[in-house]
Amino acid sequence: MQIILLKKIINKGNIGDKIKVKAGYARNFLFPKKIAIIASEKNLKFFEKKRKILEEQSKYENFKLKERFRNIKSLKEIEIYCKAGSKGKLFGSIGANHIIEKIKERGIRIMKNEIKLTNGPLKTIGKHNIKIKVKSNMCTEICVILKNNI
């Protein structure tokens, strides 16, 4: 089945590419998610008009993503106060949700799946480096400092 891509698909093509895919893949995945349309004469003419709009939207989304990444990268460290025992072990743990709340307080939007806690939730007082991966090629580290508030 010949289709026209409305969005970029890794290993398939870019916006506006006319490609051949299996009918089931197109019907069950690409069409419902509005990623592609059937490559008919009518759609080819329609798409030429729509192509410029889609490219501008894609550029704008990339610009916003890069801007958000710069804001995240400007964060060097965040402090979180929590209860801990005398040996520095927390009563509970600090996970991605706590870190997101502290980052939101600084006016930066971040999603849970972007935070990579390599050793699981943070359970001790001190400095911990965590990775934030916005996109496959946009990754940075910030320092989370856990302090005892007792």
From Swiss-Prot:
GO terms for biological process: translation. The keyword Ribosomal protein applies. SUPFAM superfamilies: L9 N-domain-like, Ribosomal protein L9 C-domain. Keywords: Ribonucleoprotein, Ribosomal protein, RNA-binding, rRNA-binding. It comes from the Bacteria. GO terms for molecular function: rRNA binding; structural constituent of ribosome. The keyword Amino-acid biosynthesis does not apply. Transmembrane segments: none annotated. Gene3D superfamilies: Ribosomal protein L9, C-terminal domain (3.10.430.100), Ribosomal protein L9, N-terminal domain (3.40.5.10). One of its GO terms (cellular component) is ribonucleoprotein complex. Pfam families: Ribosomal_L9_C, Ribosomal_L9_N. HAMAP family: Ribosomal_bL9. Belongs to the bacterial ribosomal protein bL9 family. Binds to the 23S rRNA. This is Large ribosomal subunit protein bL9. It comes from Wigglesworthia glossinidia brevipalpis. The gene is rplI.
